[in-house]
């Protein structure tokens, strides 16, 4: 019994703290929540408190610094990295309403400090919608960010880190490796985003991978098509580290096909519009030149406006297309946990699609 427990003892992981990934601190409001001018930041304190509560059977956290005598398997480091912070707002003038969306993208990174290679990465997207009568000030946004870090961010971080099965090596890995924007989708996205936004594809990859990971408890190799090299940068022990990313065995290709809205119902004072999002998702194994999954999906989101607001809806309705798309990502990723016949019937024309999700589920298991 003693030998058995030693053989399966959980790995020791060095706590690496909070880091910025592919986003510069100066381009965020998180920098005010992660202010270390007077010692530990609020994020530092929250993260340490949650790390201490972890009860994961596959690893235990050490707050010691790395030493030269550690074996390779004991040089895994955990870093919680902010990869993107997006704050958008729309104003619906007819209803005197401002909607603010805060979207935070993170990676829970486990990497080997001896060779700077990725062990596992768990993507996390946390979003919050705020309604107000006028645009929020920077001070108000910072307060809302603090609340997000104290609540939704740390709750999701804890749940993901506590339930994840960490291994020193994985037999198979999965990742989103290609984002294709068809003409309809690209025209829409370019119209509603900065023309020089080289990371626009990255945002779709982050969102889909976060839902896949959260709902299926799997690690996902970070998307790298918009990067110049197959690495990511992290800060650990006050130095920049370039972490090498493995090539996934299983590749997910996401094609965003387009967006469309239709008037569903019209009343005397209100209108209901359906905002549709359309995608194609493929799961392939390039080494075997094998396609395991290739299906088209659509999702409709019902939104009600006053007739006053619809006069100006072209200026703000893009946010509802993105809402529709994220619901599609979420529902798609849940089908490998439990089939939702109602959603599949409305989102896919393939009546035999349930068998395809069974195959995806088997592949996910190989990546755990």
Language model regions located:
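C-terminal/domain-edge helix-coil "capping" segments
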Residues: 113-186, 206, 216, 271, ...
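A short beta-strand signature
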Residues: 100-112, 273-287
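Short, solvent-exposed beta-strand/turn "edge" segments of beta-rich domains on protein surfaces
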Residues: 93-99, 268-272
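Short, low-complexity, polybasic intrinsically disordered segments
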Residues: 98-107, 194-201, 205-207, 366
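Bacterial Sec-dependent N-terminal signal peptides
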Residues: 1-13
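N-terminal segment of the mature soluble domain
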Residues: 10-83, 187-266, 275-278, 284-309, ...
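Elongated alpha-helical scaffolds
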Residues: 75-87, 97-110
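Edge/loop elements at the starts and ends of beta-strands within beta-rich repeat scaffolds
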Residues: 71-73, 100, 115-117
